[in-house]
């Protein structure tokens, strides 16, 4: 079969989550990562090359810490009363299935049509149902009209929203500011935004737009979770910061 756009890199990260789930003291449990790997093989998809897999394994502590941080972000958003969530470029992370969502939560996942089709077919074939009250996949190209497609799918622009942008910014051809302009335009006060960013540019911009921002560096985050990085992890996270922002006006 033709491999959907974005599926190879998503499978590489799924392999890292599958490995963490079987660690002695895992930061999270993702039983669905193996579902995607098996589904890819059964469909004739090519798994990531040995070189790609080795690169992912080399930053395993970083990747696991990143997943844990975004998991905690969504759990905290729900605890603070937010009921509308959006994951931009969701990939093959099955948060809609594996996190303990507050009743009444709606989760929108935006990604390439092929990625979402593969993801939902694999989980349906395995008999899995989302744990979130309402799950809405939004097939869209992030370079063209994604916010309109999100609204067409039922997104409420008047409701405070928790956004997540994970593992995406290096692939945004036009730079991040257009993406964050769109998010800002449709996020009322009380909305939250979690971003994996390189450097402080995103945080600085959000601060000028009425968002209250906190940051933590990748090395500090790995230390918090007891995942001290090796040389590969250190290189991967050298300039990476995790931005947590709340819109105040």
UniProtKB/Swiss-Prot annotation:
Its EC number is 2.1.1.-. S-adenosyl-L-methionine binds at residues 111, 141-142. Keywords: Methyltransferase, S-adenosyl-L-methionine, Transferase. The keyword tRNA-binding does not apply. SUPFAM superfamilies: S-adenosyl-L-methionine-dependent methyltransferases (SSF53335). GO terms for molecular function: methyltransferase activity. GO terms for biological process: methylation. PANTHER family: S-ADENOSYL-L-METHIONINE-DEPENDENT METHYLTRANSFERASE YKTD-RELATED (PTHR43619), S-ADENOSYL-L-METHIONINE-DEPENDENT METHYLTRANSFERASES SUPERFAMILY PROTEIN (PTHR43619:SF2). Belongs to the UPF0677 family. Exhibits S-adenosyl-L-methionine-dependent methyltransferase activity. This is Putative S-adenosyl-L-methionine-dependent methyltransferase Mkms_0592.
């Amino acid at each position: 079969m033709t491999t959907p756009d974005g599926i190879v890199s998503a499978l590489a990260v799924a392999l890292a989550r599958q490995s963490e789930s079987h660690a002695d003291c895992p930061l999270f449990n993702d039983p669905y990562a193996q579902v995607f790997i098996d589904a890819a093989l059964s469909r004739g998809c090519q798994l990531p090359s040995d070189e790609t897999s080795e690169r992912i394994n080399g930053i395993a502590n970083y990747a696991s810490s990143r997943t844990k941080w975004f998991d905690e972000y969504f759990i905290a958003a729900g605890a603070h009363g937010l009921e509308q969530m959006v994951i931009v470029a969701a990939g093959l992370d099955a948060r809609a299935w594996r996190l303990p969502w507050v009743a009444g939560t709606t989760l929108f996942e935006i990604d390439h049509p092929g990625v979402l089709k593969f993801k939902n077919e694999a989980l349906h074939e395995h008999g899995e149902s989302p744990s979130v009250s309402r799950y809405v996949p939004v097939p869209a190209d992030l370079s063209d009209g994604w916010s309109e497609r999100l609204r067409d799918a039922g997104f409420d622009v008047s409701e405070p929203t928790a956004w997540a942008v994970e593992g995406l910014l290096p692939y945004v051809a036009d730079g991040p500011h257009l993406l964050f302009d769109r998010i800002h335009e449709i996020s009322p006060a009380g909305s939250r935004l979690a971003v994996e960013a390189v450097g402080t540019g995103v945080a600085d911009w959000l601060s000028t737009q009425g968002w209250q921002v906190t940051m933590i560096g990748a090395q500090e985050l790995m230390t918090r979770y007891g995942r001290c990085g090796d040389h590969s992890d250190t290189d991967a996270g050298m300039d990476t910061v995790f931005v947590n922002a709340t819109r105040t006006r």
